[in-house]
Structure formats: structure tokens, C-alpha cells
């Protein structure tokens, strides 16, 4: 029997495992199932020129039954860092300094800005969706991802309805971004369920073992530490503080609750949309859930910013997650 997540009681009997998607450069290879356990290869070491390498990135590994139905999936986050060395006491909790799925904390190059975004989650779902292909979200293009045969694969987008609007369907269709409708209150669920993440860690919580999605109270305790500065403009984000400690949060945009498209900034010269950051909390309320959001203008002709530590957002939206330690 194979375990689902961290719950020792939630088991299954898969027939195979396979890569649903992974970011470029073969984050993992050769997945196989042996005696109910999933194995895979991750390359790390030195190349022919004796240069050290580590395959950074994200992957989604799926377990399937004999008919090819997806039974469960695991997000594999491969990053060269130790959370114990990159954490900060913030808002009353011990928080990671980088977004879930991110390759770096922050950066000024286009490559590092993009790597700092991490992956995107619909509220209450355990499986991530990839971020943009370009740091500025040009054409709303998704990052390129590949399956076990190294073939390009793409996320699917489908509106919630009586069939798709359930946690069971979402788990069995991990690559389908379930968009909200007016009738659903722009929730991907047909019947809202605030317990999918909640205050206690469960199998839907996407954070690594020992970590969880923070409650709304954590973000509500934060504020913008500095006004817009040239340095912040280079990093595309804000340093947030609880009055004692601080951490950087990239303005990584979000996926639309209505279309699933990646959005952050448009080219309207009259009223340019500022760069934005959206971070889910674990706190749901009715058909919506609380998130932290901020925006800042990098137009250069004016300075402006906004910040909400805990505001209700449509649950079908895809946003970042910043994990806190369970203690």
C-alpha cells in the first residue's frame, strides 16, 4: 500500500507512477513503483568540467491505477537550500523566506525574478500550477513543462460545474485549473469547504512536511517596511515587517479566478496596472478565502502602493504560498 501525503491511514494500491509535469532540465527522471513505494532519480554532483550542478525546479509525480486513472500526486520541490537556514519569525510564526516552489528568495536579473515567484495554488487544492514563462508575464504564457517522455504538456482550464466542482475531481485531475463562475461565487468548488486547508495540517495542505499554510492572522500583522525605492523596483516586490522582523515578498501576480490566465501588469499607458502580489492564507470564509495582497507602481512617473494583510479573495484564483513551521 502507498501512502497519500502524511496521513498513515490514507493509502492506495497504484499500478504505476509517472511524471505529470516537470520544469526543464530533468528535475527528476526514471520514476518507478517498487513494492508500493515510488522511486525516482534526481541528478546532483559534478559535470565533466568538474563543476557542481543541482537540477533546480518543480515536478508533479502521479500514481495511477491499472486503467490509467490518477489516484494521487505529489509535488516535488527541488531547491538548493535548507529551510532551517532561511526562516524568519514573522507575524507570530516561523516563516520560510522564499515562496513555495521558488528557486531563489529574490533577485534583480530577469532569471532570478522569475525564479523567485514559485508555483501557484487555487485555495484548498494540494497540487500546484506552474508560473509564467517570462518574468514580466508577456502574453500570459505558461512556463514550459514536460512529462516522463520529455514531451511538452499543458495545463487544462475548465469551468466548475456539478462534475468538476469537488475536491475529489480536483485531486484526480491535478493538471486542470478549475475556473470559477458567477453561480459558484467564483470558487472552484460547487459547495464551499473551509476545511480543505484550515488551521490544522492535512493532506490538502501543499507545504512540505513540518510546514503549513499560514492563517490570515499572520499576514494581518504585517505592513510595508519601505516606500517604493529604486532597489525595490529592481526586485519587483516589497519588504514586509511585523515591526520587529522582516522578509521580502515578490510581486508575482496571480492566475485569474475566471480564466486561469497569468496576470500582473498591462500596457495601458493611461492607467497602467501595478505589479501585484497575492499570498493565500489557510483561512476560508464562505465561498471565499483570505489572502494578503499588495501592489506597486513601477511606471517611474509616479509612486504608489497598496497593501491588505487579510482580505477576502475568490477561491478559484491561483496565488503564491509562503509556508510557516508547525510548532
Identify the function of each model-found stretch.
Residues 60, 102, 180-327:
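C-terminal, surface-exposed recognition/capping segments
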Residues 1-201, 315-327:
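Short, compositionally biased
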Amino acid at each position: 500500500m502507498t501512502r497519500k501525503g502524511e496521513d498513515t491511514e490514507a493509502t492506495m494500491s497504484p499500478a504505476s507512477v509517472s511524471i505529470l509535469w516537470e520544469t526543464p532540465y530533468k528535475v527528476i527522471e526514471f520514476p518507478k513503483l517498487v513494492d508500493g513505494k515510488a522511486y525516482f532519480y534526481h541528478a546532483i554532483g559534478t559535470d565533466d568540467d568538474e563543476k557542481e550542478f543541482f537540477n533546480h525546479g518543480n515536478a508533479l509525480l502521479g500514481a495511477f491505477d491499472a486503467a490509467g486513472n490518477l489516484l494521487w500526486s505529489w509535488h516535488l520541490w527541488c531547491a538548493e537550500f535548507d529551510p532551517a537556514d532561511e526562516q524568519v519569525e514573522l507575524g507570530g510564526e516561523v516563516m520560510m523566506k522564499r515562496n513555495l516552489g521558488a528557486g531563489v528568495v529574490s533577485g534583480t536579473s530577469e532569471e532570478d525574478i522569475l525564479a523567485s515567484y514559485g508555483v501557484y495554488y487555487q485555495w484548498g487544492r494540494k497540487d500546484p500550477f506552474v508560473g509564467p514563462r517570462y518574468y514580466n508575464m508577456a502574453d500570459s504564457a505558461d512556463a514550459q513543462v514536460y512529462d516522463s517522455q520529455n514531451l511538452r504538456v499543458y495545463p487544462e482550464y475548465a469551468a466548475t460545474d456539478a462534475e468538476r466542482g469537488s475536491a475529489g475531481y480536483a485531486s484526480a485531475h491535478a493538471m486542470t485549473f478549475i475556473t470559477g463562475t458567477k453561480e459558484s461565487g467564483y470558487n472552484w468548488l460547487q459547495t464551499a469547504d473551509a476545511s480543505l486547508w484550515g488551521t490544522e495540517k492535512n493532506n490538502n495542505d501543499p507545504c512540505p512536511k513540518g510546514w503549513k499554510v499560514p492563517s490570515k492572522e499572520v499576514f494581518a500583522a504585517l505592513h510595508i517596511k519601505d516606500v517604493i525605492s529604486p532597489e525595490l523596483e529592481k526586485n519587483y516586490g516589497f519588504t514586509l515587517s511585523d515591526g520587529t522582523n522582516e522578509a521580502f515578498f515578490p510581486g508575482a501576480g496571480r492566475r485569474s479566478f475566471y480564466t486561469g490566465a497569468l496576470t500582473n501588469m498591462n500596457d495601458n499607458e493611461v492607467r497602467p496596472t501595478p505589479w501585484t502580489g497575492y499570498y493565500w492564507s489557510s483561512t476560508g470564509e464562505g465561498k471565499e478565502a483570505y489572502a494578503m495582497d499588495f501592489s506597486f507602481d513601477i511606471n517611474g512617473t509616479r509612486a504608489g502602493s497598496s497593501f491588505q494583510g487579510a482580505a477576502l479573495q475568490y477561491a478559484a484564483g491561483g496565488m503564491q504560498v509562503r509556508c510557516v513551521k508547525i510548532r
